[in-house]
Amino acid sequence: MDRIVIQGGARLEGRIEISGAKNSALKLMAAALLTDEPVILTRMPRLADSRFLGHLLEKLGVEVSDGQDAQLRLHAATIADTFAPYDLVRKMRASFNVLGPLLAREGHARVSLPGGCAIGARPVDLHLKALKALGAQIEISEGYVSAKAPAGGLVGGEIDLPFASVGATEHAMLAASLARGETVIENAAREPEIGDLADCLTAMGATIEGAGSSTIRIQGQSRLSGVTHKVVADRIETATYALAVAAAGGDAVLEGAVLAHNKALWSSMGEAGVTVEAVADGVRVARNGSRLDSVDIETQPFPGFPTDAQAQFMALMSLANGSSVIRETIFENRFMHAPELARLGADITVHGNEAVVRGVERLRGAPVMATDLRASVSLVIAGLAAEGETVVNRVYHLDRGFERLEAKLTGCGARIERLPDGA
């Protein structure tokens, strides 16, 4: 199993190209099931998660081929199978999003309940509620969801989500695009990835209004066409590299990043003493040598502070002047990185969904272990800022969400390398 070795203390200077958003790309891949024409995705991130989903789509009959310049071509000319087995779905919960498209196109599907990061209870109840609102009959047995559409296919309906679930909103949008009539999603998620999916589905022929607001209206079509679509820039990757620059010190441009997609984060970083500004081709982040100020944050659905940047921000606050309070309101059990940051010298106390971070003057390198995707990259950030050598073990988590992480950081001056076991 690979590990990442970091020699801390180097400033980050230069440019980092931001990849397409993983959380958007996976739903766009699932959208290829809605049409018998080719779907071509550009700025497609090359990640373990996208490979996992690609294998599942191939099993369902989709032709999947990589092109040059971060391009992925998917062609579901026919659906060979509507069964998504456990061994393919368990690796990543986003695989569950094939259920709606299969149901909408073929009228039936059987999909395993999902796996993925072990972050609290992340049920699919809202996904199933949305599909039921479109007329689907749902049965759950022995770890599988069996779904059947009414005669004539799914029918538009009213979907009122109890909270703004990103996954349920996206799943409903996918299925509703091939449903008869209008679907209205109330209390819809507002993340930029929702808008990206809406843009793609609209280009395929669906009529969608209100993406980015709490009410989305979808006029389904009997048939959707192929499309070439550029995946939106990854706002979490943007946040991660911005926080890395802030922690290690330096001045870098994040190419392709969209300033408007991380306003809450930029506000907190600015309050801490980090410079963040829009430039012609992205976002510039800079920090001088002075110690940062502590800042309290609370994770919230977009446009609030993103839960997927909480661990990375905690790494930054571990070096700030004073104490900060970090409240996690989205997922339970999402402070698993705190004990590992403590191995590097961080002073963190966790009480339920709240962590108190007492800033220290310096962190010191040590062996640490990644527990999930965002936790693993928070340890990389801390290692970049620490004195001496940090070794991050179990880095397969990183490969699920970050493309060429070591190369991107090395290009800005970081001393970081990946080593296989035994090396």
From Swiss-Prot:
Pathway as given in its UniProt record: Cell wall biogenesis; peptidoglycan biosynthesis
Annotated residues for binding of phosphoenolpyruvate: K22, N23
Modified residues (2-(S-cysteinyl)pyruvic acid O-phosphothioketal): C117
InterPro entries recorded: Enolpyruvate_Tfrase_dom, Enolpyruvate_Tfrase_sf, MurA_subfamily, RNA3'P_cycl/enolpyr_Trfase_a/b, UDP_GlcNAc_COvinyl_MurA
Record-linked Gene3D superfamilies: Enolpyruvate transferase domain
Top EC class for this record: transferase
A GO MF term: UDP-N-acetylglucosamine 1-carboxyvinyltransferase activity
Species name: Maricaulis maris (strain MCS10) (Caulobacter maris)
Annotated keywords: Cell cycle, Cell division, Cell shape, Cell wall biogenesis/degradation, Cytoplasm, Peptidoglycan synthesis, Pyruvate, Transferase
Gene: murA
Cell location: Cytoplasm
Binding site for UDP-N-acetyl-alpha-D-glucosamine: R93, R122, P123, V124, D125, L126, D308, I330
Record protein name field: UDP-N-acetylglucosamine 1-carboxyvinyltransferase
Main location: cytoplasm
